[in-house]
């Protein structure tokens, strides 16, 4: 017979069972509702975050593109500014070279003026005079020294401004390189997408790097460099204009002084030639007067000798008549006539000797004055030769060096050329 075997365990009541089933069903409904709510919220969050992420990425991509455009515009402005700056540096360098050449060209007129002054120191005696030519030559030296000082100052200004432009160029180049590097980085960032390789999380990417600047500071920095470059380029243009003006003015001043000096030279030469002609005329007349005076002296001496013979004749007659005998030794008319003749001859001879002495003195005076005239002629000849040599030397200022051939040869023999009247006169004096 079968027996009932029950497991010894707790028995739940039906109400507990029903309650449990109800609770399970209710909790399942509640959990599903909560899960549904969470799923809806997750979908909303996903949609919102996706939209936000897409918008943020699009917004930042747009900002990055705009930033690239901004940096690129500044880079292009820097490109143009650097091109203009390089052109201005070249122009200012050429202007500096021009003023250096102009300064170097002033050495020739200075050497010529000093050579003329030195050459004119060879004047002799009374011709060593501070005449208008010397004053103009000294003024020419002063003008050249003043122009050289002005040009040297312009060279210094150009050099200093070139250094400043080079410094600005280095700053612009540095800024330009930074912007090129920035463009490369930003364009690389713009080209990145979700499928790009090497995407990874970084350590603290939102940190603010050291020495970061604000957008205003960035804009002010580049704008300051560009404005400074524009200002200095404008100043460089003005400096080039002043350099060109200084070169033109100094050349005009030097040319005006050269014309004035050479005019004074020509005027002085005409004065010397006029005086030389006057001295030659005086020399000719003096020589003629000396010749006539010498002829008169010879005639006077001859007459004096004849008067002496007449006196000897009268003396001999008187002496001979003293030997008349006895009463024949009378003082007759012949005696008185011979005595009067002796007195007359003695007076005549005395007067003639005085006149002869005066004539000799006059001849000596003429010879002395002739010597002074001839010495002055020699001085004038020497001075004219020196001034003519100076005029020939000054041809270097208007004739190119490769075409310059001296026309006056003062110190060496002149060959295959007719001597000038000045040299002919010098040879006559020698």
Curated annotation (Swiss-Prot):
GO cellular component: axonemal A tubule inner sheath; axonemal microtubule; microtubule cytoskeleton; microtubule organizing center; sperm flagellum
Function in brief: Microtubule inner protein (MIP) part of the dynein-decorated doublet microtubules (DMTs) in cilia and flagellar axoneme. Plays a key role in the assembly or attachment of the inner dynein arm to microtubules in sperm flagella and tracheal cilia. Forms filamentous polymers in the walls of ciliary and flagellar microtubules.
PTM entry text: Tyrosine phosphorylated.
Subcellular localization, as worded in the UniProt entry: Cytoplasm, Cytoskeleton, Cilium axoneme; Cytoplasm, Cytoskeleton, Flagellum axoneme; Cytoplasm, Cytoskeleton, Microtubule organizing center
One GO process term, biological-process aspect: flagellated sperm motility
Assembly, per entry: Microtubule inner protein component of sperm flagellar doublet microtubules. May interact with CCDC172.
Keyword Zinc in record: no
Keyword Membrane: no
Name of this chain's protein: Tektin-2
Coiled-coil regions listed: 75-162, 226-380
Record's keyword terms, sorted: Cell projection, Cilium, Coiled coil, Cytoplasm, Cytoskeleton, Flagellum, Microtubule, Phosphoprotein, Ubl conjugation
Main location: cytoplasm
Pfam families documented for this protein: Tektin
Family affiliation: Belongs to the tektin family.
